[in-house]
């Protein structure tokens, strides 16, 4: 069952965000993840418009997604992430 991590974020420091993306991106790929979408252009089709940037990452299954999120390689990126942006990560399991 494919798993998607949806990261919603508000950038606090663009330089730190670039450094975070450079550090974190390879950890996703090393754990079998694939970037599906990254963007900040938002238009509400129904309901309230939320102005957040998003990144959507696909993993083969939820176990691999969780392994990536708790991996030492990604955990090392946490200080950069916290300086770069306010983030929320949500894991979705698809059928």
Which positions does each model-derived feature cover?
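Short S/T/G/P-rich N-terminal loop/turn motif that feeds into the first structured element of a domain
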Residues: 1-70, 93-95
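C-terminal structural segments of small proteins and small subunits
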Residues: 62-90
């Amino acid at each position: 069952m494919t798993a998607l991590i949806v990261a919603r974020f508000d950038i606090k420091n663009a330089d730190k965000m670039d450094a975070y993306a450079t550090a974190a991106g390879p950890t996703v790929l090393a754990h079998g993840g694939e970037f599906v979408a990254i963007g900040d252009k938002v238009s509400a089709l129904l309901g309230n418009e939320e102005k957040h940037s998003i990144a959507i990452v696909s993993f083969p299954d939820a176990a691999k997604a969780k392994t990536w999120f708790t991996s030492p390689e990604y955990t090392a990126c946490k200080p950069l992430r916290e300086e770069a942006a306010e983030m929320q990560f949500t894991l979705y399991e698809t059928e």
